[in-house]
Design a protein with these regions (language model features):
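N-terminal signal-anchor/first transmembrane alpha helix
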Residues: 3-33
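Periplasmic/extracellular loop-to-transmembrane helix junction in inner-membrane transport proteins
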Residues: 4-11, 34-78
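Transmembrane-helix boundary motif in ABC transporter permease subunits
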Residues: 75-105
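C-terminal transmembrane helix and the adjacent membrane-cytosol boundary/short C-terminal tail
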Residues: 95, 152, 183-187, 229-266
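Generic hydrophobic transmembrane alpha-helix motif, especially the helices
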Residues: 106-142, 149-150
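Glycine-rich helix-loop "coupling/hinge" segments at transmembrane-helix boundaries
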Residues: 121-122, 151, 198-235, 254-264
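Transmembrane alpha-helices
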Residues: 133, 137, 170-203, 226-229, ...
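Short cytoplasmic-facing helical segments at TM-TM junctions of multi-pass membrane proteins
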Residues: 146-191, 212, 216
Length: 266
């Protein structure tokens, strides 16, 4: 009868551990602000930021900008990950295509996505296409490189065995190559999800009229420090949510892997 209670205690403790550092930082931050160690005009207290968030929610301003940024990041990630996956598969499976495509792709990868912003604005203007395009360019390469590496890392003996059992073409890719490459692909996707939020926020500060980046730029212009710090906190939370989403996807797509061997950190 004592076994369940003993096992449940470590589980509950393990669930609380990830929150220890964030809660500790917030408590120390609030104390430092109340004691005057942090100037409130430069770094508002957590309670002031919370009040600004409630105010923005009441006027439906925050949810609108949050939805716009999420939509842009999701669209760019979906398109970029699809392109990166396709490129990684064809270059990983075909040596001639690797020789043709990998060199140009590596040269483009060496150019920071944000360095392309002036060119992208000339191409697409300041509309939605430009912002999504910057996310696409950022997301393509982590997924491409990890897909390529994953395909090349598949055990050749497994492929030969599958061919002995008359697996060919799409069935071979779906049942052997793609599952074998999936852990590496998910690592690339996890990086890509985080990077998509980095670039979309910067892109939204350039001529946008909506989104969290626009909200932050507007708050900076009017010296609304509580709203500015609120957007930074939201970016951190969105990055954590994207990482959680990648881990859930990993659990779903890699059910055969023990939890301790999964690539995500539990």
């Amino acid at each position: 009868m004592t076994t369940p209670s003993h096992s449940s205690a470590p589980r509950s403790l393990r669930a609380l551990l990830p929150w220890v550092a964030p809660v500790g930082v917030v408590v120390l931050w609030q104390l430092a602000s109340q004691l005057g160690l942090l100037p409130r005009n430069l770094m508002p207290a957590p309670l002031a930021i919370l009040s600004a968030g409630i105010d923005a929610l009441r006027h439906q301003q925050l949810l609108l900008h949050l939805a716009v940024s999420t939509g842009r990041a999701a669209a760019g990630t979906l398109i970029g990950a699809s392109i990166g996956l396709a490129l990684g598969l064809i270059t990983g499976l075909s040596r001639p295509l690797q020789l043709v495509l990998d060199g140009p792709l590596q040269m483009i990868r060496a150019v920071p996505a944000l360095a392309l912003v002036p060119l992208v604005i000339l191409w697409f203007g300041l509309g939605e296409v430009a912002k999504i395009f910057i996310v696409v360019i950022t997301v393509v390469f982590p997924v491409y490189l990890n897909t390529f590496h994953g395909v090349r890392s598949v055990d050749p003996l497994l492929v030969e065995m599958a061919r002995v059992y008359d697996l060919r073409g799409f069935a071979l890719y779906r049942q052997v190559i793609l599952p074998g490459a999936m852990p590496s692909i998910l690592v690339g996707l996890r990086f890509a999800l985080g990077m998509s939020w980095l670039v979309i926020i910067v892109a939204e500060t350039l001529g946008a009229s909506s989104g969290l980046g626009y909200l932050a730029a507007n708050a900076r212009e009017f010296m609304q420090m509580d709203l500015l710090v609120l957007t930074i906190v939201l970016w951190a939370l969105l990055g954590k949510a994207a990482d959680w989403l990648a881990r859930q996807l990993e659990r779903r797509l890699l059910p055969w892997q023990p939890a301790g061997q999964r690539l995500s950190v539990e």
